[in-house]
Amino acid sequence: MNKKTIRDVDWAGKRALVRVDFNVPLDDQGQITDDTRIRAALPTIRYLLEHGASVVLMSHLGRPKGKPNPKYSLRPVVERLFELLPEAKEVKKTEAITGPAAEAAVAMLKPGQVLVLENTRFDPREEPNDPAMAAELAKLGDVFVNDAFGTAHRANASTEGVAHYLPAVAGFLMEKELTYIGGALNNPQRPFVTVIGGAKISDKIGVIENLLGKVDALLIGGGMANTFLLAKGLNVGDSLVEPDSVPVAQQLMARAEERGARLLLPVDVVIADAFSADAQRQVVDVSDIPAGWRVLDIGPKTIERYSAEIRAARTVIWNGPMGVFELEPFAVGTRAIAQAMAEAAANGAITIVGGGDSVAAVEQAGLADKMSHVSTGGGASLELLEGRVLPGVAALQDAE
């Protein structure tokens, strides 16, 4: 990674204005159901406190549409942060985001203390990246730290705009994400295998196109595999399919051949007569999918083939489930991929789980800690895999 990080700053007596990603899931009572994103920010916050800084944290939560909404207040996050960060001398919260009240709260901060600003999306200027809001935020710190990889693909006032008004560096989480995903894409240990799943090919065209020039093998699963099977002239019954994307699938298969990348499709599938955990189900070869049935998972021969590819790889990136993993009978393929990746990692391969549903699948399987890296950013991971420059990263100072 060619950007400055928090290690490049002398923090003694400085105020660190840190964009974190505290966009955590809440239940109906406003209780946090998964604090992974809060925990992911702790190494950066701890480092800053240990090195004599006071820390001002900003984040969005949910989609409050540019106005205050108690449902999306960061109050529960502050309470959880207080529990997770006993070494902070104090964790304070302000109802303000910018302006005199926020500036007064920051002026009271002493080294070793933490202040959490209210949800940045309560301000209608946040998402349009209004320079006036960015300049107001910049008054709250001496150095801007971006540790919110999950929003690095969005040019908001608190992720990109503020970096034009303060020295800007990456936090440890941002650095880790860019080092793992960027390293795998730009300088992979080979064989380099990617596993791409999920429902729609249209969501992942850019990813597949970018990867075809880099990978040794691309393993396709999930609903998008049906569109590839249809493009090969196979009948997919009542399966989820995108007829409009058939020409794209044909182009991608041709491009894979041109570039010497092996694009592997399922050879057998688990089909059901309804979209339900209680449906009748059977395993068939992809050439034998009957009318009225739908593909809901990859089959055992495909699992064996894909698992062997993963275990033989030195770098693996996975994005998207292999089937309808939220229905227990159709989670087998997705779990098997997670297991094969854990085995590859145990043998010294770099294994990266790239955001979204794959992360949930790996966590459900209890294998998250067996991976080299589990990404915290769904959309941001996808854009990196597409080869795009992330605005929140581009705005940081280059390493010298």
Curated annotation (Swiss-Prot):
User: By its UniProt entry, which Pfam families does this protein fall under?
Assistant: PGK (PF00162)
The GO annotation for biological process reads: gluconeogenesis; glycolytic process
Q: EC?
A: 2.7.2.3
What keywords is this UniProt entry annotated with?
A: ATP-binding, Cytoplasm, Glycolysis, Kinase, Nucleotide-binding, Transferase
- Cross-referenced InterPro entries, in alphabetical order? Phosphoglycerate_kinase, Phosphoglycerate_kinase_N, Phosphoglycerate_kinase_sf
Please list the residues that bind ATP.
K204, E326, G355, G356, D357, S358
Extract the GO molecular function terms from the UniProt entry.
ADP binding; ATP binding; phosphoglycerate kinase activity
Kind of enzyme, top EC level? transferase
Q: Which GO terms describe its cellular component?
A: cytosol
Catalytic reaction(s) noted: (2R)-3-phosphoglycerate + ATP = (2R)-3-phospho-glyceroyl phosphate + ADP
Keyword Cell membrane assigned to the entry: answer is no
Q: What metabolic or biological pathway is this protein involved in?
A: Carbohydrate degradation; glycolysis; pyruvate from D-glyceraldehyde 3-phosphate: step 2/5
Q: Which residues bind substrate?
A: D21, F22, N23, R37, H60, L61, G62, R63, R121, R154
Localization terms from the record: Cytoplasm
The organism's place on the tree of life at top rank: Bacteria
Assembly and oligomerization: Monomer.
The family classification in the record reads:
Belongs to the phosphoglycerate kinase family.
Report what the protein is called: Phosphoglycerate kinase
